[in-house]
């Protein structure tokens, strides 16, 4: 059993972005390729959770397994994706990543996993005053809590965190760069992120 594993939530077509964000171009590759490069350098095993409408396209770009949500919970948002990844890879801890944060660094996963300890169910960063539950780490034991929530048709990450013993970590306390957590949700944000990158 791996001690640590990674789960990338690739989703599917994005209505706000106009195309699958996972496959958006970034620094000569794609969002998903960049994220996986950073994750796989820090974690033993990584799996991508993808919507069926883009699964085959994602598989062409990556060298890790690409799976869909467990059929019974398909389309139930991030909780369904996380629990599907937990079922696919057996590990103690899982680092989660959305597919729309292409600035992330392998350093983040090292920092995150250094913060884990058995007394906690989750380690969640607070960046610029906001909780970031999709850039977090979750212990294997959280799986049963997620199933219970999905059975009750509860889908929010906040509902999961309210049931967990969470260690909240302020980004500035662990030398985390706030740029690592920038989400790209629209084409305007995409253009801005590319400009910011070229100005560095």
Swiss-Prot record:
<comment type="similarity">
    <text>Belongs to the MobA family.</text>
</comment>
<keyword id="KW-0808">Transferase</keyword>
<keyword id="KW-0342">GTP-binding</keyword>
<protein>
    <recommendedName>
        <fullName>Probable molybdenum cofactor guanylyltransferase</fullName>
        <ecNumber>2.7.7.77</ecNumber>
    </recommendedName>
</protein>
<feature type="binding site">
    <location>
        <position position="100"/>
    </location>
    <ligand>
        <name>Mg(2+)</name>
    </ligand>
</feature>
<dbReference type="InterPro" id="IPR025877">
    <property type="entry name" value="MobA-like_NTP_Trfase"/>
</dbReference>
<keyword id="KW-0963">Cytoplasm</keyword>
<dbReference type="InterPro" id="IPR029044">
    <property type="entry name" value="Nucleotide-diphossugar_trans"/>
</dbReference>
<keyword id="KW-0460">Magnesium</keyword>
<feature type="binding site">
    <location>
        <position position="21"/>
    </location>
    <ligand>
        <name>GTP</name>
    </ligand>
</feature>
<comment type="function">
    <text>Transfers a GMP moiety from GTP to Mo-molybdopterin (Mo-MPT) cofactor (Moco or molybdenum cofactor) to form Mo-molybdopterin guanine dinucleotide (Mo-MGD) cofactor.</text>
</comment>
<dbReference type="GO" id="GO:0046872">
    <property type="term" value="F:metal ion binding"/>
</dbReference>
<dbReference type="GO" id="GO:0061603">
    <property type="term" value="F:molybdenum cofactor guanylyltransferase activity"/>
</dbReference>
<keyword id="KW-0547">Nucleotide-binding</keyword>
<dbReference type="GO" id="GO:0006777">
    <property type="term" value="P:Mo-molybdopterin cofactor biosynthetic process"/>
</dbReference>
<feature type="binding site">
    <location>
        <position position="100"/>
    </location>
    <ligand>
        <name>GTP</name>
    </ligand>
</feature>
<feature type="binding site">
    <location>
        <position position="69"/>
    </location>
    <ligand>
        <name>GTP</name>
    </ligand>
</feature>
<dbReference type="Pfam" id="PF12804">
    <property type="entry name" value="NTP_transf_3"/>
</dbReference>
<feature type="binding site">
    <location>
        <begin position="9"/>
        <end position="11"/>
    </location>
    <ligand>
        <name>GTP</name>
    </ligand>
</feature>
<dbReference type="GO" id="GO:0005737">
    <property type="term" value="C:cytoplasm"/>
</dbReference>
<dbReference type="InterPro" id="IPR013482">
    <property type="entry name" value="Molybde_CF_guanTrfase"/>
</dbReference>
<keyword id="KW-0501">Molybdenum cofactor biosynthesis</keyword>
<keyword id="KW-0479">Metal-binding</keyword>
<dbReference type="GO" id="GO:0005525">
    <property type="term" value="F:GTP binding"/>
</dbReference>
């Amino acid at each position: 059993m791996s001690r640590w594993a990674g789960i990338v939530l690739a989703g599917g077509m994005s209505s706000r972005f106009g195309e699958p964000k996972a496959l958006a171009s970034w620094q000569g590759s794609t969002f998903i390729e960049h994220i996986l490069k950073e994750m796989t350098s820090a974690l033993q095993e990584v799996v991508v959770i993808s919507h069926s409408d883009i699964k085959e396209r994602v598989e062409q770009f990556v060298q890790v397994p690409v799976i869909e949500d467990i059929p019974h919970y398909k389309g139930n948002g991030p909780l369904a994706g996380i629990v599907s990844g937990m079922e696919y890879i057996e590990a103690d801890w899982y680092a989660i990543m959305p597919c729309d944060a292409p600035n992330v660094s392998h350093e983040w996963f090292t920092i995150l996993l250094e913060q884990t300890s058995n007394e906690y169910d989750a380690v969640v960063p607070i960046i610029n005053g906001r909780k970031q539950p999709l850039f977090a780490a979750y212990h294997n034991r959280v799986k049963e809590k997620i199933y219970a929530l999905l059975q009750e048709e509860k889908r929010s990450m906040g509902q999961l965190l309210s049931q967990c013993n969470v260690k909240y970590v302020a980004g500035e306390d662990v030398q985390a760069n706030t740029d690592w957590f920038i989400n790209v949700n629209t084409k305007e944000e995409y253009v801005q992120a590319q400009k910011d990158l070229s100005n560095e």
